[in-house]
Amino acid sequence: MNALRTVPVMLDIARRIEKLSPNAHLINFSNPSGIIAEALLNHTDVKVIGLCNCFINMHASIKENLGTADFDYEYVGLNHLSWITSVTVNGENILESLGKPVSMKNIPNLDYDDELLASVPAIPSPYLGYFYLKEAQLKKCLEAEKTRGEICVEIEESLLKQYEDPALEIKPKELMLRGGALYSTAAVSIADAIENDKNEYHVAGVKNNGSLPFMEDNDVIEAKCLVNNKGAFPVKLKNEINPYIKGLMQSVKAYERLTVKAAMTGSRADALAALMVHPLIGDFDKAKLVLDDMLKANAEYIHRGFNE
């Protein structure tokens, strides 16, 4: 539902950028970041780079583990559905020696079984817990006293109250609970690489453009990119991708494409199909129940076609 509300707004902003600043680069934080980038890169001429803080937190964890930033990596996925598939030091892949994946404060933490990690030999981003251990993750969410959304509302109300004080000079502790760690570092680093033509490597949301042969060229993926003053360009991977990763990416990408179409046209059929193809739902009765409730609750904020 976030996408159905946000895609039209971001498209409107993009149209203004096309008119007022056609050479600008738009670094997008708006969630759902991958779907927003999918919409803007395929339906506008704006130079969009999608951004998330998952990778930079994963990179920081590996750096802390190794005691050095002198390592290379391969990275594949979509926004909130991504993996580090190799970590090399002096040409040697040390992925298996790195231990358990990094966790994030805004996601219920579950301990991965060694056999699970061995079955898909890659470091999963924290959001993969929802796919790897769907029932256990759902159980944790249902047992929690409050939903993540309710917690975020409380955090933001507290932050906004503190920001009313012009004398505030310290970073509120609530910021560490919101789940946006290192976002500023990621954004400034990419902006710096573009503005100063640095030819640096960063992970970003961009069009596939042939970098992953199992995805469509126009699919927006999250990839290791070479970034310079012309934009961000995905780097082709050297290693073969696990079939599980390929299959999951393709099914979630189908969901993203259908969601963009639904958001732009107000098509209930496309919205329903999007939910049915998503691996976390995949059931007509569940999809219909959720969609009916959410379309009703958000009627004034979404495409009017949904209400016709």
Question: Where do the PLM segments sit?
Answer:
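Charge-dense, low-complexity intrinsically disordered segments
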Residues: 1-4, 49, 177, 246
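Rossmann-fold NAD(P)-binding glycine/threonine-rich loop
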Residues: 1-43
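Rossmann-fold dinucleotide-binding core
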Residues: 25, 29-92
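Long, compositionally biased stretches enriched for glycine and/or charged residues
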Residues: 63-308
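A non-catalytic, amphipathic alpha-helix used as a structural packing/dimerization or gating element
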Residues: 12, 57, 250-254
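Intrinsic structural disorder
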Residues: 18, 32-35, 53, 232-233, ...
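Soluble or luminal CAZymes and related metallo-dependent hydrolases
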Residues: 2-9, 54, 182, 251
